[in-house]
């Protein structure tokens, strides 16, 4: 999960989107609720089950990538807590094809992001289907019980391409409060609190550069 989130956060940052803030919020949400599992839904479709009202994008994205064969039959994410992170995790895993997602923002408006091959477009309103017909051929629905509509593009492909080039040449300014949250939990995860966890725990004391 940490690898997927790290790569997704960097991917978002390259396009001027707040990857580190999204990752910090997703981590905080999961730490508060923790319970996430994959369950079979109707018609052989799979989706994450979470005690929290909103599904953890961290684990929804990880489940999608880990259970690659299942995604050919479909996967449903109901109201992800951080849809941008989920989108980036899926986009970086697929590496090709078309990916689209839509969600409700804090002002009750609809926001969306679309990836088609190497082109990236942000929508004011978008559709509720997240697809990649590439090598994996996955089909993921992302819904929030809304009536979705297609609307004009807010930021065109060239604008995002320029952002990406600027990020590579000039770097980006990170949100330090979000980074401190990630640093705190990284330290807790990488420093075992007992000999037993050091020998037998997840990662067994390995260092993850992400």
Regions found by a protein language model. Give the residues of each.
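Aromatic-enriched hydrophobic runs in primary sequence
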Residues: 2-9, 60-67, 153
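A glycine-rich, acidic short-motif signal
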Residues: 20, 24-119
